[in-house]
A protein has these predicted regions:
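Membrane-associated feature with strongest affinity for ZDHHC
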Residues: 1-205
Length: 205
């Protein structure tokens, strides 16, 4: 059959291995368009839940930025030691400590997650994954089409943390710049061979 020479079988699961899929050693599953295993959400980020991972990073960074802007006007209180008429400090140490800890943790998380979020959104815009990197440029079919394969076709739903209509495509066939797509091997009955990669992930969290 045309393209049969390109069909691969996963050595660890013994199942058909679609293009861009990888075996996750943590969940022991063959994952469609696998990006990485995230211990913070205890799940593998792949074709059917990558949208939620991207939104998780985006909204977490926005929340951290909002908290930072909210406490910024109170920063002078860290150095405003209230004194009585005799020059003795009146109090407020607990408030100053809490404010200082909040500021330090918020800035640290924002400095760590901000670049991480930008990296993953940049890869999404280029139709890349952490595993594939820039080794597969043929899957970069344009900014809009790339994002539709993750966020869905309806742009009003892109930033909604719900599945909605789901990502464009089935995670098995991937359009390329040349207009081609990977072929799915057929069994004797004319149906695709069994692959655990066709099973959707559970939602993040």
């Amino acid at each position: 059959r045309p393209g049969s020479s390109e069909l691969k079988v996963c050595r660890r699961s013994g199942l058909y291995k679609p293009p861009r899929s990888h075996f996750c050693s943590v969940t022991r599953r063959l994952t469609l368009n696998m990006d990485h295993y995230c211990p913070w959400v205890a799940n593998t980020v792949g074709h059917y839940n990558r949208k939620f991972f991207l939104l998780f990073l985006l909204y977490t960074c926005l929340l951290l930025a909002y908290v930072l802007l909210s406490i910024a006007p109170q920063l002078p209180d860290l150095f405003d030691w209230a004194l009585d008429g005799d020059g003795r400090w009146v109090g407020g140490v607990a408030y100053a400590v809490v404010l200082g800890v909040m500021l330090a943790v918020d800035v640290l998380l924002l400095l760590l997650l901000g670049p991480f979020m930008c990296l993953h959104w940049k890869m999404a815009m280029r139709n890349q994954t952490t595993i594939d990197g820039d080794r597969l440029p043929q899957y970069d079919i344009g900014l809009s089409a790339n994002l539709e394969q993750i966020l869905g076709r309806r742009r009003l739903h892109w930033f909604c943390p719900c599945y909605c209509d789901g990502p464009v495509g089935d995670g098995v066939h991937w359009p390329t710049k040349t207009g081609g797509a990977a072929l799915v091997p057929l069994g004797g009955s004319g149906t695709p061979l069994r692959t655990s990669a066709a099973v959707r992930h559970r939602p993040l969290g």
